[in-house]
Amino acid sequence: MSNLKQLRTRIKSVKSTQKITKAMQLVSASKLTKIKNQIAHSNFYVEAISKMMSTVLSADIYDFPIEAQKFFNTETNKANLLIVMTSERGLCGTFNYMIIKQVKSDVETLKSKGEKIKLIIIGKKGYEALKKPYESYIDSYFELPKNHDENLMLQIKQKIMALVANLEVSNCTIYFNRFKNAMTQSMTKQQILPIEKYHDDSKIEEANYEYEGENLIQNLINLYVNSQINYALLQNRASEEGSRMTAMENATNNAHDIINKLVLKLNRSRQAIITTELIEIIAGSEAV
């Protein structure tokens, strides 16, 4: 009987876990739908800013102010800025692992070349994984809010702008997961600085803006950095929720399989006990 009690307790425990994983799956699915809508709206903005930047730089009719020139600087004696985007929570498959693995590999490569490194880490999981081996390289750490927040984007942008303005870094690469669908996310590293300068005389006629040259370039740089950070944050958030939704769906299905096996084992144990009792009763009646 004690074996039956243990089986019932275990079945109850697995059912409880199944309810939790199912709830988490539904929450992630709901969040993912909202984020996908945000991505759809932001894609147009990112493309528009990139096109505007390309047009102005191709025209090459403006004098670049000193502060703006720092964002096009290709000097190699400055630090490499790595922006690492992870999550606050786990239970999302290999979402964080792939990012952290790539960052560690790249940091070790840069170290072997004797290059300077600065890390900006977003998300508790990334900070926990990178703090011990690379604490001296960490410049900033930002916690992720529960929902996509423009304040976080502005804080990261201001940090990047300050580091570039102070001539501490010459290039900036963002590490994030690019969202494809709920089951597929690809680890992506995207270099956003230095900004490449183009020259194409065919673009000159298209460059017709009311801003003064210096203000235009500086404002475009601000918008460009903003759009790139916002894009990466949204992609990473969607990838996190998609990965968690898939992981929780798999966990729910596994729990269902375990419950079926335990119920089958429980029924067989009960049948064995009943059969044993019947045999004892029959044997007793025959003895009488």
UniProtKB/Swiss-Prot annotation:
Coiled-coil stretches: none
Example of a GO MF term: proton-transporting ATP synthase activity, rotational mechanism
Bilayer disposition of the protein: Peripheral membrane protein
Pfam families per UniProt: ATP-synt
InterPro entries from the UniProt entry: ATP_synth_F1_ATPase_gsu, ATP_synth_F1_gsu
Superkingdom of origin organism: Bacteria
Biological role: Produces ATP from ADP in the presence of a proton gradient across the membrane. The gamma chain is believed to be important in regulating ATPase activity and the flow of protons through the CF(0) complex.
Family that this chain belongs to: Belongs to the ATPase gamma chain family.
Record's subunit section: F-type ATPases have 2 components, CF(1) - the catalytic core - and CF(0) - the membrane proton channel. CF(1) has five subunits: alpha(3), beta(3), gamma(1), delta(1), epsilon(1). CF(0) has three main subunits: a, b and c.
HAMAP family registered for this protein in UniProt: ATP_synth_gamma_bact
Designated name of the protein: ATP synthase gamma chain
Gene: atpG
